[in-house]
Amino acid sequence: MKQIFLHTSLAAMALAVTTTGAAPERCDGTVQLTSQSNFQVRQAGTQTFVQFDFTGLHDICLADRSVVTGIVEGHLVQRISANGDFSLTFDEVLSYNGGTLGYRGEGSLTGGNWQSNVMTVGLGTGPLAGIHGQGTFVFTGPASLADVIYYVYTP
């Protein structure tokens, strides 16, 4: 399922590039989680599963090259192994100036190797309509992340 979603997202981004002729533009941003709720922990053998809802702040680059901060609400699920390896998935909706844009991401730490992927989901609304992006993220603290997302802007 993850592979189908990834291929669909890549195809949508490629279509956006082909349609507009625009190359993806790099956007360096941050995410700061400001609250967590509905915190749940479940043990299954040597695996620990943690999930919670969150709110926070997330930078996004607009088509005019301005960087603005939106409010995000989302849900995160994390699996932690006894050896310290873990994986996580999240879905969030960013709200800014009356518009919304969905994001979906996943990351994993295996043997000290961090891999991540984040992408926009859907068409966006209001001032966030027509924004498509894909990139990576890293944790910079317990509730903060840095991301690099390449955006394509379609009319």
Report residues per predicted region:
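Bacterial N-terminal signal peptides that target proteins for export
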Residues: M1-S9
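Boundary at the C-terminal end of the N-terminal hydrophobic targeting segment
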Residues: A16, G21-P24
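Bacterial N-terminal signal peptides
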Residues: T8-A16
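Beta-strand-enriched cores of mature, soluble protein domains
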Residues: A23-P155
